[in-house]
Regions:
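Conserved, mostly hydrophobic/aromatic
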Residues: 20, 67, 85, 96, ...
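Histidine-acidic metal/acid-base catalytic patches
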Residues: 163-290
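Active-site acidic/histidine proton-transfer and metal-coordination neighborhood
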Residues: 74-176
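Active-site beta-loop-alpha junctions enriched in small/polar residues
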Residues: 6-10, 33-35, 68-71, 109-111, ...
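Residue-level preference for long, well-ordered alpha-helices that form the structural scaffold
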Residues: 40, 44-47, 78-81, 85, ...
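Aromatic/hydrophobic pocket-lining residues that form the small-molecule binding cavity
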Residues: 13, 48, 85, 89, ...
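N-terminal pre-domain/capping segments
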Residues: 1-68, 72, 76-93, 284-290
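Acidic (Asp/Glu)-rich catalytic clusters
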Residues: 18-24, 43-65, 92-100, 128-139, ...
Length: 290
């Protein structure tokens, strides 16, 4: 399993990759633009090519993922917001594809009371439209649907919901899944023991399919199990705990899936010691199953 880190791109894409290498990350995740602004960052073809070249120069960082802005809401019942979200998703995906990223992680959004079934067709249509507009080739950058913590009317709070979205998009092979450990915990899906982790892997396989699981977001939780709130905590300092995370990370089915550390969420993000801690948790999980 690759242990990666979310890195800041305020100084540019290539410096972000360099920072990932400096802290010992095997993979990086980068926002393609400010996560709380609509205006996409404009990267020239030369800048995107420079990032792809830098990846070859830093083989220790084996994978790049991008994260879409938080403002996107494909499930919105408001036509203006839905259209704005689709355009923003397309812009984010275009940048990720130009960087050679292995996936663009997306929070689907909230139906705001209109209901999951009502929002489902629009969500699926928007996903496929963005994928087609950027790159119809199946080898292009996929969109990775992230599981939600379950707050309010968010879409994707369960793997059953994520499977329904993919099904509504005719099973498009350019759609994958990103599993966030804190969101799992907050949405009331247990995984903190070896038997519970085994059950979770079976659930994923029978809903979205393990082949669609492309990356993990590795976070502890500030809130209790089932609290339905998105609140990340540093590894080992939250209500999941290092042992709970180890139970999941050690599962054999996940060893080819990059795990992206998103904490600490303040300052410059994950540090060398945080990446080392995550590796220790992984090693403990593997030892438990040896």
């Amino acid at each position: 399993m690759l242990i990666g880190a979310h890195v800041r791109a305020g100084k540019g894409l290539v410096p972000a990759l360099q920072h990932g290498a400096d802290i010992g990350a095997d993979a990086v995740q980068i926002f393609t633009q400010s996560p709380r602004m609509w205006k996409p960052s404009q990267y020239s073809d030369e800048v995107l090519a420079a990032y792809r070249a830098a990846q070859l120069e830093h083989p220790s960082v084996a994978s790049t993922f991008c994260h879409a802005t938080y403002l996107i809401n494909l499930a919105s019942p408001e036509p203006e917001l839905a259209a704005k979200s689709r355009a923003c998703l397309t812009a984010n995906l275009s940048t990720a594809d130009g960087m050679g990223a292995e996936g663009l992680v997306l929070h689907i959004g909230s139906h705001r009371g209109s209901g999951f079934e009502t929002a489902l067709p629009a969500v699926a249509d928007a996903l496929v439209a963005s994928l087609d507009e950027v790159d119809a080739d199946p080898s292009g950058c996929p969109i990775l649907l992230e599981n939600a913590a379950g707050a309010g009317d968010t879409v994707g709070r369960s793997f059953e919901e994520l499977a329904r979205v993919i099904e509504a998009a005719d099973g498009d092979e350019r759609l994958g899944v990103c599993l966030d450990t804190q969101h799992l915990w907050a949405s009331g899906i247990p995984f903190g023991t070896v038997p519970a982790a085994d059950d979770l892997i079976d659930l994923i396989d029978t809903t979205v399919g393990l082949a669609r699981l492309r990356c993990l977001h590795l976070n502890d939780s500030k809130v209790d199990f089932g609290a339905n709130r998105d609140r990340h905590e540093n590894i080992g300092d939250g209500t999941i705990g290092a042992d709970g995370l180890a139970a999941l990370l050690g599962h054999p089915a996940l060893q080819g899936v990059p795990a992206i550390l998103e904490v600490p969420g303040e300052g410059d993000g994950p540090r060398t010691e945080d990446v080392a801690t995550a590796r220790q948790v992984l090693e403990a999980g593997l030892a438990r199953r040896a």
